[in-house]
Amino acid sequence: MGAQSKYAQQLNNERSLAPFIPFRSQVGPTTVITRDGDFVRTWRIAGLAFETQDKEELLIRKDQLNTLFRAIASNNVALWSHNVRRRTWDHLKSFFSNPFCDALDKKYYGSFSGYRMMSNELYLTVIYRPVPAKISRLFNVAVHRSHAEILQEQQLAIRKLDEIGNQIETSLRRYGGDDGRGIEVLSTYEDKHGALCSQQLEFYNFLLSGEWQKVRVPSCPLDEYLGTGWVYAGTETIEIRTANATRYARGIDFKDYASHTEPGILNGLMYSDYEYVITQSFSFMTKRDGKEFLTRQKQRLQNTEDGSASQIMEMDIAIDQLGRGDFVMGEYHYSLLVFAEDMETVRHNTSHAMNILQDNGFLATVIATATDAAFYAQLPCNWRYRPRVAGLTSLNFAGLSCFHNFRAGKRDGNPWGQALTLLKTPSGQPAYLNFHYSKGDEDNFDKKLLGNTRIIGQSGAGKTVLMNFCLAQAQKYLHNAPMGMCNVFFDKDQGAKGTILAIGGKYLAIRNGEPTGFNPFQMEPTAGNILFLEKLVQVLVSRDGQHVTTTDESRISHAIRTVMRMRPELRRLSTVLQNVTEGSDRQDRENSVAKRLAKWCFDDGTGKRGTFWWVLDCPQDQIDFNTHSNYGFDGTDFLDNADVRTPISMYLLHRMELAIDGRRFIYWMDEAWKWVDDEAFSEFANNKQLTIRKQNGLGVFATQMPSSLLNSKVASALVQQVATEIYLPNPKADYHEYTDGFKVTNEEFDIIRSMSEESRMFLVKQGHHSMICRLELNGFDDELAILSGSSDNNELLDQVIAEVGDDPSVWLPVFQERRKARIASSKSTGR
C-alpha cells in the first residue's frame, strides 16, 4: 500500500474550479473562446455621471441604450454586465520646498486614513454564439471538420463580433468624458518583462478570486489556469480564500421586479461603504420567442385571475410594441454579491443592500439555494448557473443596466502633471481636481491647454478656504517646472494674506494714503518698459479730463528717457518731474504737464508732497518676481478710489505681464467683478482669458456675487473662456443667473441650492460633465487659521511679524501659540 500525504483526504475533497469556468483559450488580443465555441469580448465603460445629469438626459440615454440593444439583437448574441464596487486607495505624490505647504499636504493626505475610498467599475461583455442551440455546438462537431474549416469558422465569428463591437463602441463612447473615450476594450498587453498578459483574463480571474492581479496568456486551457482562490459554499454564505486574504460573500437576487425601471433605479447601492459585484445577463430572444413569452404571461394572468384588467391591457400593449420593434425580449438574470472580511460584517452589508433594493420596489431575497451557482454565474457564458431567469424587455434592461457612474476627473497626464489635489465625494469615489481640462487618457503634459477657473460661492460657504488651499497645493507645480512658476493673487479683504505669507510670498495691502511700495521707474530700462512708463505718465496727467497734446507727449518721453538713464536709486516720479520742461507762455505753464504731474510726486517741485505721491513715487520698488514667486495685492481700499485705481492697476498688470514669460503662471482674483470694473483690468482680463493658455498660464476668478460678475464689462470672457467651474452651496441661488448666465443644467442648479452650507461640498464642472466634491478639513484648526483669512487672525499676524520678522518658519509657531492663548483667554472670561 503506497504512502499517502498527511493531507490526502483534504486534497481529495478539494473542489476544482475548472468545471465552472467556461473559457477555453484566448484567440486574439480581445477575444476569448469557450468550451462550447462561444466568442467573448469585454469592455470597460467609464459610465455616465448620473449625479448631476438632468433626468431628461438620463431618459434619453436609456432610450439610446434600448436602440443599441435592438440593433444587435439576435439569438446568437448575449450580454453580461458587471458593476464592481471595490475599495481603492490613492495619494498624490508631491514635492514642496515650502514647509507650510509640505506639512499641509502631508496632514491632508494623512486625513484619508480610515476613509472609505471606493471605486465603481463598469464592464460589458458580449458573447457571440455561432450555434446558439444546446446541441451541435461548433466544437462538439469539430471532429468532422478540418483544421482549416475550424479556423475559417473562428475568423467569421470574430468578424461578426467585431461588427457588434463597433456598434457598441460607437454608441457608448460618450459614456465618460467629452472626449469620446467612455469605452475601452479589454485587451492583451506586454508587461515589462515582455510577457503577454490579458486584461480580459484579469477581469475574469477577479470575478473568481476577488483580487486583481496580472494574468499571463497561458498555453494551457483557461479553465485549468484561471482561479487563484478556493471557493467554499455554505447555505447562504460563500467563503473565498486566496493566498492573501479570506473573504465572505452573500448573494441577493430578485423574486419580483419593480413595476417601473427608471434609469438608475439601482444607483443607491453605489453610495454604500462595502464591496460588491452586480452581475446582470441578457440573452436575446427571437421575436417569435419573445411574443410567445408575453402571450404566456398574459394567459397566466387571465387563467389564474391574478391580473387586473389594466395588467392584461399592459400585456397587450407590450405584445404590440414588440411587434412594432419598440424593444426586444431577452432572458435576464440579476445577482448582487456583497463582500466582507468576516461573517458578521457580510450579514450586516447584505441587510443594508436588501433595504436599498426593497426601497426601490424590488422583492429581493438572499440566495440560500445553490449559492455557489450564483457565484459562478458571474462569469460570462455560465448560463446553466443563472439564478431566477426571467423574461425582460430590452427597455427594462436598459434601465437596470444603464452604466451610470461617478465623474472622477483626471489624475495623470495633465498639462502640469498630476492633478492639483484629491478630493472626497459622497460616494467615496476619488475625485481629481484640475485647473486645466484635458481629454481622457491622453498625455497632455506640457501642452498649452485652457485652464481658466471660475469659483462661485456665497459668504460662509468656504470660498476663501478653497482658494487658499488650492493656492497652497499649486506650489507643487514649481518642482517640475523648468522655467519656474509664479502666482499673483489680487485679493479682497485680505483673505489670502496669511496663505501668501505662509508660503513664503510677499503681500502688499494697498491702503489709501499709505505708501504702496511701488516705483515703476526702477524697472529695467527696456524699450517696452519705457513705452509703458510714457503711457502711465500720460494717464496720470490726464486723470481730470485734461488733454495730452503732442508736445506734452514729447516732453513726457524726453523726461522719462532721461531719468531711465540714471542709476536705479535715483529713478522715481519726482525725478521725472524735475526733467519735464514747462511751456514758454503763461497759459502753457498754468496747464503744463509739470503742474498736472506734481500731485503724483513725493516732491512737487516746491518741497511739498503731492496729494497722490504715495501711489507710484516710493523710494524703493517692492515688486521683484526674482525674489518672490508668490505675490498678493489687496485692493479693498484702492478699488473704490477712482483717482488712483487705474494707475495702480496699470502698473500691477504690467509687472504681471512681464512675469508671464513661459513660466507656469496663475493669477487669482477674489471678487473678480470688483477688479475688472477698472478699465485696465477689464481690458487685461478680456484679452488674457483668450491668450494666457499659450503663455503657459491661467486665471482663477472668484466671487460671492454672481450678478456682479455677469454684469461686468468682460462677462462673456469670464463665463465662456473657462475650463473649470466650481460652484459652492447657495440656498439663495438665482435660477436665471446660474442657468442662463453660467449655463448650469437644471439638475446642477438643484444640487447647488440643496447642498448644505456647512457640508463643505461643491460642484465641479468641466465641459458637459460635473461631479460633487468635498474639501474636508476637520481637525485642521491651525491650518484654517491661515487659510480662512479672518480679520482678527490677520491683525495678530501683523503684530507677530512686526516683532519676529517675516520668515514663516519663525512667525508661524509664535502666531499659533498666541492665537491659542487668545482663544483660551476668551473662553476663561466667557467672551
From Swiss-Prot:
Domain of life: Bacteria
Entry's induction text: Specifically induced within macrophages by phagosome acidification. Induced at 37 degrees Celsius in minimal medium, suggesting that nutritional stress is a regulating signal.
Signal peptide: none
Gene Ontology MF annotations: ATP binding
Record has Nucleus as a keyword: no
Pfam families (alphabetical): CagE_TrbE_VirB, P-loop_TraG
Keyword line: ATP-binding, Nucleotide-binding, Virulence
InterPro entries the record matches: CagE_TrbE_VirB (IPR004346), CagE_TrbE_VirB_cntrl_dom (IPR018145), P-loop_NTPase (IPR027417), P-loop_TraG (IPR043964), T4SS_component (IPR051162)
Keyword Cytoplasm: no
Positions annotated to bind ATP: G457, Q458, S459, G460, A461, G462, K463, T464
Additional record remark: Transcription of the operon is maximal in early exponential phase.
Family of the protein in this entry: Belongs to the TrbE/VirB4 family.
Cited NCBIfam families: VirB4_CagE
Functional description taken from the UniProt entry: The VirB system could be required for the establishment of the replication niche in the host.
Protein name (database record): Type IV secretion system protein virB4
Source organism (scientific name): Brucella suis biovar 1 (strain 1330)
